[in-house]
Regions:
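N-terminal amphipathic alpha-helix/helix-capping segment at the start of soluble metabolic enzymes
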Residues: 1-15, 22, 282-285
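Glycine-rich, positively charged N-terminal anion/phosphate-binding segment
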Residues: 2-3, 26-35, 52-70
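Active-site mouth loops of central-metabolism enzymes
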Residues: 12-28, 74-86, 139-155, 232-246
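Conserved, mostly hydrophobic/aromatic
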Residues: 16, 44, 95, 163, ...
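Active-site beta-loop-alpha junctions enriched in small/polar residues
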Residues: 17-20, 47-51, 77-83, 108-110, ...
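Glycine-rich, proline-tolerant flexible connector loops at the mouths of alpha/beta enzymes
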Residues: 41-62, 108-118, 169-182, 268-271
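Active-site pocket-lining/capping segments in soluble small-molecule metabolic enzymes
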Residues: 118, 122-143, 191-245, 250, ...
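C-terminal helical cap(s) of enzyme catalytic domains, especially alpha/beta-barrels
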Residues: 126, 182, 271-285
Length: 285
């Protein structure tokens, strides 16, 4: 099933997970999937490896497991900055053979340990190249507060429109903590005639060090209310978890009340996070 079919007809609920780095963690990911799939998401996206890692085997295996064992639609992240056309062709061949149609097309993070290839400079290049090569549904990433490398919001919207014009049918947003920023971003997209579903991405604050790293990577800002939570509870793990979950839940309820296209939850492979969020919105979404 193509994710665009679900996202165009309902408010979607989806999760992001990442493949385990070690064989010893495979049992944990199975237990995580048991919980996540029981929550009946519309899809689960599987990341491609931190920093543009060339080891994508675990991504494919995890996506296969989600589709075959749990009958939930997987979305495979695919980066292109460190790949040439032949390597992308092989990846597309494997996805087609496994019946995986949904691809989140990404440029990928720059990595000083990996050589950047000249074949693909942007996610839009990847989409344009792969679109005629298979029956894929392409998703794209978007940044409500601008990609860290974008000069300004005008440039950000221009690049995003290029991505949609290339064939991205659904946009998943990076994390943010101020819903007002997201609403302004969506309005700017609609003015620019970007009319595909834009699904907000939410990451509950459960680990202060992790969240600060993600904000540096994604360009998200700290609203004052959010800063108070971090400062008040960052030295109390249990309190930060509860406060972070409550903050995320309040964000999600507000987003759904304002008729956003769904919710994409960055689970950090933590099934407790997903379950608590879903319990809090079971009668809303």
């Amino acid at each position: 099933m193509k994710i665009s079919d679900a996202c165009n007809h309902k408010k979607s609920l989806s999760f992001e997970i990442f493949p385990p780095k070690k064989d010893s963690e495979l049992i944990n990911i199975d237990a995580t999937l048991d919980v996540l799939c029981e929550l009946q998401p519309d899809f689960i996206s599987v990341t491609f490896g931190a920093g543009g890692s060339l080891n994508c085997n675990r991504t494919i295996e995890l996506a296969k497991k989600i589709k075959q064992n749990y009958h939930v639609e997987p979305v495979v992240h695919l980066t292109c900055l460190h790949y040439n056309r032949a390597e992308i062709d092989e990846f597309a061949r494997i996805l087609t053979a496994e019946g995986i149609q949904n691809v989140l097309a990404l440029r990928g993070d720059r990595n000083p340990d990996l050589t950047e290839k000249d074949d693909f400079k942007h996610a839009s290049d990847l989409i344009s190249y792969l679109k005629p090569k298979g029956d894929f549904c392409f998703l794209g990433a978007c940044y409500p507060e601008c990609h860290p490398e974008s000069a300004n919001k005008i440039e950000e919207i221009r690049h995003l429109k290029e991505k949609v014009n290339a064939g991205a049918e659904v946009l998943l947003s990076q994390l943010f903590f101020d819903n007002t920023q997201f609403y302004r971003f969506v309005e700017d997209c609609r003015i620019a005639d970007i009319n595909v579903p834009i699904v907000p991405g939410i990451m509950p604050v459960i680990n202060a060090a992790q969240i600060k790293r993600m904000i540096t990577m994604c360009g998200a800002s700290f609203p004052e209310r959010f800063q108070k939570i971090i400062h008040k509870f960052e030295d109390n793990k249990a309190a930060l978890f509860d406060a972070g979950m409550s903050y995320a839940l309040s964000q999600i309820i507000d987003l759904l009340a304002n008729d956003t296209d769904g919710i994409h939850l960055y689970t950090m492979n933590n099934p407790v996070v997903a379950r608590r969020i879903c319990e809090g919105i079971q009668h809303i979404i």
